[in-house]
Amino acid sequence: MNDTLAQLMEESIKQVWSQRNSVRRMVALEAIYAKDSTLFEVGEIITGYDAINDKVSRTVNGMPADFVFTRLKPVIINNNIGRLVWGLGPKDKPPVATGMDIAVFENGKIKSLYVFLDT
C-alpha cells in the first residue's frame, strides 16, 4: 500500500503540477485526487477538481515553459500521510526552487495536499 501511495504523490507532480494542458490535467486530477480534495497553500485553501485545476493553471502559466516539478528525495509514507520533497526548474537541470508536499490519503487517493515552498 505504501508504494501505491508514494506513486500517487509522484504522479501528482508529473501529471498534475507539471502538466500545462488543463484537460489532461483534469483527467489526472480525477485519477489521483479524491472528488472533494483540498489543496492548502500558505494563505489559500482550494477545494474540488475545478478549483484545484484553475490554481495549477495559474501556477504553471507563471513558470517558464521548460520548468517541471521533480522528486528530489524518495517519498516517505507514514500510515495515511505522505511526504514528497520536490524541486522546480528546467528539466534535467538543478532546481531553482524547492519545497515539500504533505498528502493525506483517503480510499487510495489524495484527500488533502499541503504545499510548502522553501525558496
List PLM regions with ranges.
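A solvent-exposed, acidic/Ser-Thr-rich amphipathic alpha-helical stretch
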Residues: 26-78
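A beta-strand edge to alpha-helix "cap/lid" segment located at domain peripheries
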Residues: 4, 57-119
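A near-ubiquitous, low-amplitude feature marking generic local secondary-structure context
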Residues: 12, 35, 39, 86, ...
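Short acidic-aromatic low-complexity motifs
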Residues: 2-35
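Short histidine/acidic/glycine/proline-rich micro-motifs that form metal-
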Residues: 15-19, 43-46, 90
